[in-house]
Every structure is written in structure tokens, then in C-alpha cells.
Amino acid sequence: MEALVYTFLLVGTLGIIFFAIFFREPPRIVK
């Protein structure tokens, strides 16, 4: 169960960093 929690936290942190970089730059993909 601990491994599942660690993987969840890892994916969560990576997701937050990805969204931070994505929203920081102008979203060209939408247009």
C-alpha cells in the first residue's frame, strides 16, 4: 500500500509541475 501512495504522490507532483509550466506559457495548442 505504501508503494501505491508514493507513486500517487509522485504523479501528483509531476502533474502540478506540468500544469504550472503549461499555464505559465501561452497555450498555443488551444488555438
UniProtKB/Swiss-Prot annotation:
One of its GO terms (cellular component) is photosystem II reaction center. It holds the Pfam family PsbT. It is found in: Plastid, Chloroplast thylakoid membrane. The chain crosses the membrane at residues 3-23. It comes from the Eukaryota. The keyword Transmembrane helix applies. Keywords: Chloroplast, Membrane, Photosynthesis, Photosystem II, Plastid, Thylakoid, Transmembrane, Transmembrane helix. GO terms for biological process: photosynthesis. It is a single-pass membrane protein. PSII is composed of 1 copy each of membrane proteins PsbA, PsbB, PsbC, PsbD, PsbE, PsbF, PsbH, PsbI, PsbJ, PsbK, PsbL, PsbM, PsbT, PsbY, PsbZ, Psb30/Ycf12, at least 3 peripheral proteins of the oxygen-evolving complex and a large number of cofactors. It forms dimeric complexes. HAMAP family: PSII_PsbT. Belongs to the PsbT family. This is Photosystem II reaction center protein T. It comes from Chlorella vulgaris. The gene is psbT.
